[in-house]
Amino acid sequence: MAEKKRAQEQEKVQEDQKMQNEQNECEEVEKKLQECEEKYLRVHADFENTKKRLEREKIQAIEYSLEKFAQDLLPALDSLDMALAAVSHDNLNAEEAVKELKKGIELTIDQFIKAFNKNGIEVIEIEEGGEFNPHLHEAILQVDDAEKKAGQIVQVIQKGYKYKERILRPAKVSVAKGNE
């Protein structure tokens, strides 16, 4: 009987140990779960903060996207001011005033073109006598020209411009009708 009692006590001790081990395991799993939940909340908060920061930066980039371009245009505006100041002097005769004004306008055009090129805007290059391209040109006039084939460009009326690969404005041209 003592053996039976001892066996029962030993069985009870083993059950208690097993239960204690399971309880310890359960506590460890709960602790790990809590740690994972805390990590998740931190990562989620970091993600939300990053998302908000990127949205703010995007809005600022859009708001100030033209700032660099505007700064590049300021020298052209300065040239116009200087040209006006140069022709405003009373001691210039009409011919000198026109020369100064022409010089100022040419300088301004050069500065505009430099600012445009710096920002990815280019003049669409066209050769008179070249073929009309509806993607780059807009035919404003058709003219009789015995020296040119039908569809050849006779004259560039207004320059065209492109921004990178997009056409901002097609070049306005006159084209030959051709011989009928």
UniProtKB/Swiss-Prot annotation:
It comes from the Bacteria. One of its GO terms (biological process) is protein folding. Residues 1-25 are annotated as: Disordered. PROSITE patterns: GRPE. Residues 1-19 have a biased composition (Basic and acidic residues). It is found in: Cytoplasm. Disulfide bonds: none annotated. GO terms for cellular component: cytosol. Its main location: cytoplasm. Keywords: Chaperone, Cytoplasm, Stress response. GO terms for molecular function: adenyl-nucleotide exchange factor activity; protein homodimerization activity; protein-folding chaperone binding; unfolded protein binding. Belongs to the GrpE family. Homodimer. Participates actively in the response to hyperosmotic and heat shock by preventing the aggregation of stress-denatured proteins, in association with DnaK and GrpE. It is the nucleotide exchange factor for DnaK and may function as a thermosensor. Unfolded proteins bind initially to DnaJ; upon interaction with the DnaJ-bound protein, DnaK hydrolyzes its bound ATP, resulting in the formation of a stable complex. GrpE releases ADP from DnaK; ATP binding to DnaK triggers the release of the substrate protein, thus completing the reaction cycle. This is Protein GrpE. It comes from Nitratiruptor sp. (strain SB155-2). The lineage of its organism: Bacteria, Pseudomonadati, Campylobacterota, Epsilonproteobacteria, Nautiliales.
